[in-house]
């Protein structure tokens, strides 16, 4: 038997994939230049072309609340089961949440 991979990006073949019309390394500048304030709701939408600040696959598509900023990245509080976790995500992997 072949040993299953245990890497950080394993089981991400379809999650970290761009559709045909989204291909390219540069994210839309309108999404990157948004300045989020603490308390803003955001959707974690990973851009697989940019590896820095990429969140774990467990948090893909989750809605979180911006807690603060650390360097260029944002601290986002996300619910994972019964526990709230604070993750560090770069703005290329965030979208504003519209209610």
From Swiss-Prot:
Keywords for the protein's UniProt record, in alphabetical order: Ribonucleoprotein, Ribosomal protein
GO CC annotation, single: ribonucleoprotein complex
An individual GO BP term: translation
Pfam families noted in UniProt: Ribosomal_L21e
Gene Ontology molecular function terms on file: structural constituent of ribosome
Source domain of life: Archaea
Family label: Belongs to the eukaryotic ribosomal protein eL21 family.
Protein name as annotated: Large ribosomal subunit protein eL21
Name of the encoding gene: rpl21e
């Amino acid at each position: 038997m072949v040993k299953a991979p245990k890497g950080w990006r394993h089981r991400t073949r379809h999650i970290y994939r761009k559709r045909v019309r989204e291909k390219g390394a540069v994210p839309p500048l309108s999404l990157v230049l948004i300045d989020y304030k603490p308390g803003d709701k955001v959707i974690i939408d990973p851009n697989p072309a940019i590896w820095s600040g990429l969140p774990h696959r467990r948090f893909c598509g989750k809605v979180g609340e911006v807690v603060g900023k650390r360097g260029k990245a944002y601290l986002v509080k996300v619910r994972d089961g019964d526990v709230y976790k604070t993750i560090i995500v770069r703005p290329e992997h965030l979208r504003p949440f519209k209610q």
